[in-house]
Amino acid sequence: MMGGICSRKRDQPVIEEGGVSRVVSGRYCKSSSSKWLGTSFFRSTVEQSPGVAGICPSLLELCISKICRDIDKYSSLSLLPRDVSQQIFNELVCSQSLTHDSLQAFRDCALEDVGLGEYPSVNDSWMDAICSQGSSLLSVDLSGSEVTDAGLALLKDCSNLQSLTYNYCDHVSEHGLEHISGLSNLKCLSFKRSSAISAEGMHTFSSLFNLEKLDLERCPEIHGGFVHLKGLTKLKSLNVRCCKCVTDSDLKAISGLTNLNELQISNCNITDSGISYLKGLQKLNMLNLEGCNVTSACLESISALVALAYLNLNRCSLSDEGCDKFSGLTNLKVLSLGFNSITDACLVHLKGLTNLESLNLDSCKIGDEGLANLAGFVLMKNLELSDTEVGSNGIRHLSGLKNLEKLNLSFTLVTDSSLKKLSGLTSLKSLNLDARQITDAGLAAITGLTKLTHLDLFGARISDSGANSLKHFKNLQSLEICGGGLTDAGVKNLKDLVCLTWLNLSQNCNLTDKSLEVISGLTALVSLNISNSRITNEGLQYLKPLKNLRSLTLESSKVTASEIRKLQFAALPNLVSFRPE
């Protein structure tokens, strides 16, 4: 059994008893913030209730769990199969149990992946053990660390390194960058928000001929350095979002990178003239220009990029003029035109884009007549119409979009009576009806949409009577009802929505501790907001069963921060964010 594990290739699926497939040497947990909210794969498996029939951790999982608990007893794990060591390492990172001292046990373990992004206390003293993996090391993430030039220098022995992520780090200089110039096998390199990446420093990249993905998002000093990328002919993805220093001349420098299929230049100082340099990038599949200083004139150049499947032109000062250029982009799957001065006249030119799966028209001057041009978008899954002039007459044009999964009608003119026209959209999973004119009658009209997992009724006027309709939405994972019309009686209708992980009932000022008693049964909750209510400290006892709760907001209530802290300490170990604090 152990020999079989040892022979597995990187990221090879393993079929265990019962037909369960998992991937060895993958990252079981990725943190999205420094608070490390992610839960570990092994912990969730091993700590399953022993009374649940049919659930039994594998011998390998039990062994790994045991080693993790006793990690301080081991001076070296180098005799273990590489994949087992990798899984132990991943588990310690995910549970935030890895320390500088316990890391030493992984010296010379031939680890392939060291993912320490935003992990606390990582500095140069960790790098010797990390780099002892030598030529086995393929991927390193040191984002948010205190690793300096000296630490980066040790990577020179990791000659097979394919991916290096060093985001949000302020302790490296241009001199330190030179240490990666010899890592000729690098395919992915990320230095988000780094002041060390200057035009001069970018010469380091010129020797990385195998580079396929480069991420320099929010790097403020890179203008003029794009000339050093000219020889990177294998480059497929370039991200320089939010680099205000990037101008048209920088795009001219990369106009010969004809293998590019993804270009992220949102919120850069790019004009229509700069976009003209992109016309030769015929393999470009994804282009993000959100927030650039372009106008409808740029559509002439964009129309030459016929392979585009993803195009983001949000906040680009577009008008109807020139929108006829969209008609030739028939491969588009995702088109974002939000926050532009386009009207129904623009939508006429989108009519033939029948491959569209997602369309964003947020805050555009779109009305009912314009929606008639969307009726043929049978592949549409996501439609954003928030803050438009769409009303009841326009909704009928959406009735044939049977594949629609996400629809945002917040702050539109849609009324209760028109919501009946959505009854056939049974694939809907997310619906936003945040509008004051929506009432109990509107909620009753959509009870057939039983696949809904996300329902936003934030500003809708839903009363206790209307809340009775919520019992039809058994699959709801997130729910917002903040119109002020709910009392404890209405909250009782939530008791069977056991899939809820995110619940916002703020602004319902008549809710009392009795509501918390009902909510105590919603044990999957991760986030709960009942601000502006009559909840008291006495009611906090009902939250004790909510072991998964990570965020609790009870502002403008009768609850004190000290009592929430007591609750956190006694019963809610996963609670990391609460208000009042």
Per-region residue spans from a language model:
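Amphipathic alpha-helical protein-protein interaction segments
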Residues: 49-57, 74, 78, 145, ...
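Compact recognition or signaling/catalytic modules
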Residues: 184-193, 198-199, 206-249, 255-320, ...
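Alpha-solenoid helical-repeat scaffolds
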Residues: 94-208, 212-218, 222, 227-231, ...
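Leucine-rich solenoid repeat scaffolds
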Residues: 539-581
